[in-house]
Amino acid sequence: MTLHDVTATVPEIGIAMIGSGLMAKSHTMGYRNVESVYGSTPFRPRFAVLADASEDLARRGAESLGYARYTTNWRDALTDPDIDIVDIVTPNFLH
């Protein structure tokens, strides 16, 4: 019997989340569950950076949602070479 690793060929995409409120939770859950809705996908999400103006909210959001790093400066996410997608979930008046 030969075991084949189907995850080895699926590239990861680095996600940066700008904002840490309800929509950050909702979007993160969506990324986590995309395969359960659509089946096999050509990528696997990697939760790289969460940004929020409040350091406390950024830290707590990153910890609770599973992001590897956090920042209080959204520009850090834009210039990070590990980021493929920037998801802006700030309040409407901020985007």
Regions found by a protein language model. Give the residues of each.
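Beta-loop-alpha module in the N-terminal Rossmann-like domain of NAD(P)-dependent dehydrogenases
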Residues: 54-56, 65-95
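N-terminal Rossmann-like dinucleotide-binding module
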Residues: 1-65
